[in-house]
Amino acid sequence: MSLKGKLQRMKKHMALDEGEQKIEAGKQENHFDDIPFLEEWEAFGMKPFIFEDEYCLIREVEYPLSHRHGLYSFSELEEVITLWNQSGLSHTLSAKGYNKNNLFFFDTETTGLGGGAGNTIFLLGHARVYEDRVTVKQHLLPKPGNEVALYQSFLSEVDITSLVTYNGKAFDWPQVKTRHTLIRDRLPKLPEFGHFDLLHGARRLWKHKMDRVSLGTVEKEELGIRRLEDTPGYLAPMLYFHFIKAQEPDLLKGVLHHNEMDVLSLISLYIHMSKKILSESHAPKEHSEAYAMAKWFMAHKETDQAIKQLERLIEKSFEDQDSARLDLSLLYKKQNRLEEAVPLWEKLSRSQNQKCRYAAVIELAKYFEHKKKEFGKALQVAEQSLSDAACLSEKETEKLHVRIARLKRKYSS
């Protein structure tokens, strides 16, 4: 074929391509025209996201780093990230190796509280802290049949290093995985990431004083956040079902605002918990909370930090005082600091708490038998624990009698 012929053929193809592009643009314009209340949505800051023959709505809100949400300004996140990077602590909330925009604060709104394929996520909300701002982004499912667009809009721009949620390990992310599985052939893969679920820490620290360790309760009791004219989360499913029928934006504006506050509260709560863990000036002052923090350190095998917390509580009067003393004595024993452990066991041997009293008496018996070789004293101490036999398990009772029999043999030989 001549050069002229080739050029003519290319010209035809170019014309066809231009025509297809115009048709596609026309389709998209028509799709925009089909979106109910589009002008009202846009006035609220929402924009359509079109994917294939589906759409969702996206809203973006920005806050300055100086903005205070409860006790903290968002700029304080950088401070706690710096503290984590300077710390040698091993902890589930550690952000060592991260910077502030690696944390992805995430929450969802769903059509129900149960799990499984019958429960639909209709709102994905997330926040990120950048060098000069905090950005909250929300992806709304306008009606059933548009989930591919919803998750495409979310996954196409989300680069998650570590997720920060409140009950997200048990609820939010499993729900995302379930919905993603149903349409995975049309979507990018879900990312791999670390996960900080703040609910677990909240339960550890505050379950002794909160009937429900919900995010709303933690906001009021710990973060100093008072929501005004908030749409409660439990109303979200009902409002969404009304919205599906009516499509009126006013039905969901309150839900969107509630979700926005939720993800912002995750930032403040992460700052709050991190400061309690890392900063002496923010360490728990209330005795039961300080004990809970010590047990959290124990769970992470951070013995020195746990001892530091427990030593502050030795002479404090509170409900779990003897349990705290017992934990401290066992940590001393672990570090071979028996001269500090024994006085605690002797004090606990007179405790009103049967469990602590029995544990302390057994530790004293072990000490006199194995360390001091004072078998008579070990026997005397072990027999003291027979008074608690009624509250012991069958296995514990059997072990106690074996110990006493062994000590009698050693003492008489």
From Swiss-Prot:
It comes from the Bacteria. It holds the Pfam family RNase_H_2. InterPro entries: RNaseH-like_sf, TPR-like_helical_dom_sf, YprB_RNase_H-like_dom. PANTHER family: EXONUCLEASE-LIKE PROTEIN (PTHR38462), YPRB RIBONUCLEASE H-LIKE DOMAIN-CONTAINING PROTEIN (PTHR38462:SF1). This is Uncharacterized protein YprB. It comes from Bacillus subtilis (strain 168).
